[in-house]
């Protein structure tokens, strides 16, 4: 328990840099860097909200496919091609939800997520780390990594007014390419325009 409290304190101090104070917040990518992004390669698949209930578009990296066996209308799972029948395949899921926080209240949203994760980790030997940054699209992003030794779960929360997109990587193999695939999905996510 003492280890979790120390990690939590370090995480709160680390995440404090994502506040409203312009001198300590992470730098948002410039408009130029957002517009200079590469289009998905022919081997990648761009998914739009017309394909599912997720209100946005994103790119599924080459070598990954939808897991029909695990996906639902509100949460889509992806696994590496050829691993559908593995006992514990690395997987990436995407889910969009609503919350009671405006974008200006993102720190309260972050604190609620930390509290929820700590409740879920009660009694589990794990290390929790957190970070705050921006996606390549310029959206606020909170990243929480839960290391249980043999399983590493990384949660990427892309934040907007009264909502979020959670892309979660569950990494059983320790593969760095799996981590990169999840981050590529996060950075490619674009909210549908509301109107």
Regions found by a protein language model. Give the residues of each.
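N-terminal targeting sequences that direct proteins away from the cytosol to non-cytosolic compartments
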Residues: 6-8, 18-77, 170-195
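Secretory pathway targeting signatures of secreted, lumenal, and periplasmic proteins
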Residues: 57-103
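Soluble non-cytosolic domains of exported or imported proteins
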Residues: 103-108, 176-180
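Signature of long, low-cysteine stretches enriched in small and polar/charged residues
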Residues: 112-158
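Short, well-structured beta-strand
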Residues: 139-195
């Amino acid at each position: 328990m003492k280890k979790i409290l120390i990690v939590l304190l370090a995480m709160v101090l680390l995440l404090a840099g994502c506040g409203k104070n312009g001198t300590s917040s992470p730098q948002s990518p410039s408009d130029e860097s957002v517009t200079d992004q590469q289009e998905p390669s022919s081997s990648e698949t761009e998914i739009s909200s017309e394909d599912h209930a997720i209100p946005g578009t994103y790119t599924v990296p080459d070598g990954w496919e939808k897991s029909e066996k695990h996906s639902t209308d509100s949460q889509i799972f992806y696994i590496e091609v050829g691993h559908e029948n593995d006992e514990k395949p690395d997987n990436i899921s995407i889910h969009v939800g609503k919350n009671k926080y405006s974008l200006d209240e993102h720190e309260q949203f972050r604190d609620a997520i930390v509290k929820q994760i700590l409740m879920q980790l009660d009694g589990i030997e794990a290390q929790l780390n957190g970070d705050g940054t921006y996606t390549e699209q310029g959206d606020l992003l909170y990243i929480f990594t839960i290391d249980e030794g043999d399983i590493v779960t990384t949660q990427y929360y892309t934040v907007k007014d009264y909502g979020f997109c959670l892309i979660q990587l569950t990494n059983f193999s320790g593969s760095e390419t799996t981590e990169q695939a999840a981050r590529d999905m996060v950075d490619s996510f674009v909210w549908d325009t509301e109107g």
